[in-house]
Amino acid sequence: MATTTPPLDRLSPAQAQPAVVVRFKSIGSAPIMKNNVFKATAGHKFQAVIMFLRQQLGMKKEDSLFTYINAAFAPAPDDTVGSLYKSFGTEGHLIVNYSNTQAWG
């Protein structure tokens, strides 16, 4: 009987890292995403979320993008998604507001 290797996205529970549900919400004149809910690995840095968001919005490197957690503060790019969720998660989501102009602070 032949065995097959599971796909990379189907790791065993011992190997799998927890996922965090991230909900993106636009602010001001920023483009609205058609699908705004995604899962991110808890161990990823917030910088990975920013890069993913830029890709989803089709932004160039020189385009401005400001991100906020719960419309309150701008997280550091080296914060982990998991720590942000543990501290600021709302109703099972990490809410990330985004704008192409500075909205707060």
From Swiss-Prot:
GO terms for cellular component: Atg12-Atg5-Atg16 complex; autophagosome membrane; phagophore assembly site membrane. GO terms for molecular function: protein tag activity. It is found in: Preautophagosomal structure membrane. CDD domains: Ubl_ATG12. InterPro entries: Atg12, Ubiquitin-like_domsf. It is a peripheral membrane protein. It comes from the Eukaryota. GO terms for biological process: autophagosome assembly; autophagosome maturation; autophagy of mitochondrion; glycophagy; piecemeal microautophagy of the nucleus; protein transport. Keywords: Autophagy, Isopeptide bond, Membrane, Protein transport, Transport, Ubl conjugation pathway. There is a cross-link at G105 (Glycyl lysine isopeptide (Gly-Lys) (interchain with K-168 in ATG5)). Belongs to the ATG12 family. Ubiquitin-like protein involved in cytoplasm to vacuole transport (Cvt), autophagy vesicles formation, mitophagy, and nucleophagy. Conjugation with ATG5 through a ubiquitin-like conjugating system involving also ATG7 as an E1-like activating enzyme and ATG10 as an E2-like conjugating enzyme, is essential for its function. The ATG12-ATG5 conjugate functions as an E3-like enzyme which is required for lipidation of ATG8 and ATG8 association to the vesicle membranes. Forms a conjugate with ATG5. PANTHER family: AUTOPHAGY PROTEIN 12 (PTHR13385), UBIQUITIN-LIKE PROTEIN ATG12 (PTHR13385:SF0). This is Ubiquitin-like protein ATG12.
